Amino acid sequence: MLFRSLPHPIDAGLAALEMQGTVARMKSRGDPLRLPSLELRIGIHTGPVISGVVGNRRFAFDIWGDAVNIASFMEAHCLAGRINVSDIVAGHAKALFELEPRGPVEAKHERAHEMFFLNRLKPEFSSDQHGQRPNETFAAEYDRLTGRPPSQLTEDLSSP
């Protein structure tokens, strides 16, 4: 069965900021068990993929395609604690997020990939000083850019 799903790169940016914030809060609390510190690198790209369930006895869901390989490349060439996005994602995200150009990075047997760090939401779209939580202005701009209201954003705005 084939179907098309259109999650937006802006959603991926918001999810990445949330993950980054969660890891930062965990690290700031300290670790009473003295386990190794958790480091997180996030790479984001967007494009067509093929998905499916594989396996005969033990089933697993997986995705394949150039977009998956480029997202993996973005993550592999990221620094710990940062979010690395492709030029395509940056084009979708630049209106709402602060981006830091990194320049092109050569990929083996492929073209160079232009990369950007996604640092935070722009201050006018953020409800916190760190730029991790969207505000109501963000919700209106998101709706204008994507043509749909952000999923569960209104609930997120009301929670601490």
Language-model features: locations:
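Catalytic/regulatory signature loops of cyclic-dinucleotide turnover enzymes
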Residues: K27, H45-T46, D66-D87
